[in-house]
């Protein structure tokens, strides 16, 4: 289980103590425009943080986060000329320019008298000879990886001007066993595949987990007692409850942006329609009313519109409607069928799964259906989910002849596709908002 106390234990001092101790020059030169499409990764040197093994481990996670983004190219430490012995002092900038390190990260990790870890870092513009930013954090020792992710986010934001996505978690379906006796459990992990924990025991089939905006709840579909139902799971306590005891099958749940409602598909009399349920009053509202299968609803980030999948035209396509169910409009018109639409946190794009020509592809289009782009194609790619900054997607892939699915990430350029390593097969990922 994800303990809320662990999240609250992390005290972010940056902006208060950090602002006084670590200055940021207004004329720092290093920047990375990530809106230009395919860019050259920025060479960056991430030194081992002082003191000891923990400092080296923190810097390794930071470098791995930055490299995995595809926007940074951490320089091999064997090329370093200067050995940082005092992260408070200005480095020898000429030594770092020689190895083309356009940015430099230094820092230290120490243990306080009360047992907490204190982690601090400085980001330097080597060619301008200036410090760009610096922050410090306090946390319990078991949260050291979170500190590393937060520092990586701070570096990402300072250089790109946009929020990072490293201090996040992913909930997914962990799959083990043979195809004939497949065990599926809800699981949660850090976005880089570490700190995996199972949330259910695998006795029932589970599908489509989704985070609440508060990050403290997950909604998902379960076949407990042979009855397909939508459930709410409290991550702190492990307590779960059914979202409405409907006579028909409920599936494809997702929270509204304000966390007050769950939108889902309810099957009755052979067809499925989109409903919302107010989580306080438990009242339901029907949004679609067709003889087709309407499913996979997803809110726009402002909560004003909903994208969904419907086969009312003969095969699955993507539709958009207002949050009250009015103005239902088809937006996908390419070859093949479209499914699993999910709105970007930025509101500018909708990601989807497309089946055409014997392949399953992950793509994006604008909310009006224009600008369709396929990011990756293969034997079976499905279930895109957005990083909270709207720059990266995660999905699951079943390769031809493989024993089970695996998770992959890819950026909006269609480049930097990477395997997200998990202890077992994995499917149905859902990315959390940034942690607090």
UniProtKB/Swiss-Prot annotation:
Domain of life assignment: Bacteria
UniProt keyword terms in alphabetical order: Cell cycle, Cell division, Periplasm, Signal
InterPro entries to which the protein is assigned, alphabetical: 6-blade_b-propeller_TolB-like, PD40, Tol-Pal_TolB, TolB_N
Compartmental location: Periplasm
Signal peptide (UniProt feature, chain positions): 1-19
GO BP, sorted A to Z: cell division; protein import
Chief site of localization: periplasm
Entry GO terms, CC: periplasmic space
PANTHER family: PROTEIN TOLB (PTHR36842:SF1), PROTEIN TOLB HOMOLOG (PTHR36842)
Similarity-based family: Belongs to the TolB family.
Its biological purpose: Part of the Tol-Pal system, which plays a role in outer membrane invagination during cell division and is important for maintaining outer membrane integrity.
Record note on quaternary structure: The Tol-Pal system is composed of five core proteins: the inner membrane proteins TolA, TolQ and TolR, the periplasmic protein TolB and the outer membrane protein Pal. They form a network linking the inner and outer membranes and the peptidoglycan layer.
The protein's name: Tol-Pal system protein TolB
Gene name per UniProt: tolB
